[in-house]
UniProtKB/Swiss-Prot annotation:
One of its GO terms (biological process) is protein folding. InterPro entries: Chap_CCT_eta, Chaperone_TCP-1, Chaperonin_TCP-1_CS, Cpn60/GroEL/TCP-1, GroEL-like_apical_dom_sf, GROEL-like_equatorial_sf, TCP-1-like_intermed_sf, TCP-1_chaperonin. Belongs to the TCP-1 chaperonin family. This is Probable T-complex protein 1 subunit eta. Heterooligomeric complex of about 850 to 900 kDa that forms two stacked rings, 12 to 16 nm in diameter. Residues 531-545 have a biased composition (Low complexity). Keywords: ATP-binding, Chaperone, Cytoplasm, Nucleotide-binding, Phosphoprotein. Residues 527-558 are annotated as: Disordered. GO terms for molecular function: ATP binding; ATP hydrolysis activity; ATP-dependent protein folding chaperone; unfolded protein binding. The modification Phosphoserine is found at S176. It comes from Schizosaccharomyces pombe (strain 972 / ATCC 24843). Pfam families: Cpn60_TCP1.
Amino acid sequence: MSLGGPQIPVIVLKEGTDDSQGRGQLLSNINACVAVQDTIRTTLGPLGADKLMVDDRGEVVISNDGATIMKLLDIVHPAAKTLVDIARAQDAEVGDGTTSVVVFAGELLREARTFVEDGVSSHLIIRGYRKAAQLAVNKIKEIAIHLDLSDEGKLRDLLTKCASTAMNSKLIRSNSTFFTKMVVDAVLTLDQEDLNENMIGIKKVPGGAMEDSLLVKGVAFKKTFSYAGFEQQPKFFKNPKILCLDVELELKAEKDNAEVRVDKVQEYQNIVDAEWRIIFSKLEAIVATGAKVVLSKLPIGDLATQYFADRDIFCAGRVAADDLNRVVQAVGGSIQSTCSNIEEKHLGTCDTFEERQIGGDRFNLFEGCPKAKTCTLILRGGADQFIAEVERSLHDAIMIVKHALKNNLVVAGGGACEMELSKYLRDYSLTISGKQQNFIAAFARSLEVIPRQLCDNAGFDSTNILNKLRMQHAKGEMWAGVDMDSEGVANNFEKFVWEPSTVKSNAILSATEAATLILSVDETIKNEPSQQPQAPQGALPPGAANRIMRGRGRGMPR
């Protein structure tokens, strides 16, 4: 029963909170994601453009890698940040297809925008998109070609074709033959049961040509800081015992938190003698193990360096933790945090150890490692930005080759797979009734953005080529795709434009989840940034400082 009085408004959110809801907010979220798609879509494909980005520190990055671009874009719109997440997830999961997943997600939202403007419930669109995505993934499993990797003679050739497809869209496409061989060799070096890509190290050495890059079948890392006496140490061993430590072998003055009170000069001398005895006992214990190569995360000082040099032992301190961990995994043994009770099982070994000059740097190389199969790619190039882009390109190619080995299933690239899925979903949509027919047809149209964008980026007539592709797929040519060489249409499977099927499946599922997530949001609540307390202006009045501090920490005595 109403008493007729004015209703008092209930304030739930803090004053200053930005609260936007309704169809207008949903369209705003869609438009933000479409704007991000428009930024990155020009980088798609072998003839896509590169982006030059300058961060807040003035560092320059040149790349056409989707995950790198999305990471460096300073996106502030909360909905558009979802596209950054799916690009990172695609890069972490399969390594390639990061640009495609963002472009496809943006196109799904572009198609959905028309339905939202017409007042269609977003939940109906979500249901249609999810059904279409599942149908597309099932179709990929149906049409994917199984590679016969049992023949070692054909194995390398098949993997090379997969790697070259990933390379052709990168900055190093002119040298793709050289780097493709390096990538395939690197992946085949790994344990084929595990295929752990973390066992492939990548080191960058500025200077020289790209063809000066090399593959080391073992562990390699840059020479660490060394002290006097290092020059006398041997730089080459065969079958050495290797000891890895997390121990500091250095005499240094303790400046902080140190106080010694002595009554006699002899007492001070006893302290100094004890320090020398401690470090010499550590060095003697290391020599007694029979190790010829000693590595440590912590510094190895000049005294220890000269001590080891006199006994024909190589040492390196301040070794990076990731490099030392790779050495331990490759040569065996374990990292010791003490120099006492070191046994034979704690030591590793390899066929050869060598310190070699590469460009302007010296590298420590461990080759012929028995415990774990590992390798290191040493990249050369003129500019730091170029070498960094080469590293990103090789990472993508390594992941592609890894998934081709693991799953043995490939599909044709160049938009062929997307066009076949689009035809399949378009035909399927005609067999059902109701609004779901429109949503599945919209999903089918969205898939065509990949071949269309490939044509646009290459300067081709996208309308003409897409019409030809539709005709070819209607005739049953399911591997017909964009031919970048002849500006036309070709059977991309016969042209060896191959991609692992997992790249396509993961991209479709990730893009669909991102699009449906955006469509499910009907309200955005943005809290006002908290204000930092302002310091009082001018000098404090007498006694004010004591009053401010009163009550902090322990209570003041009464």
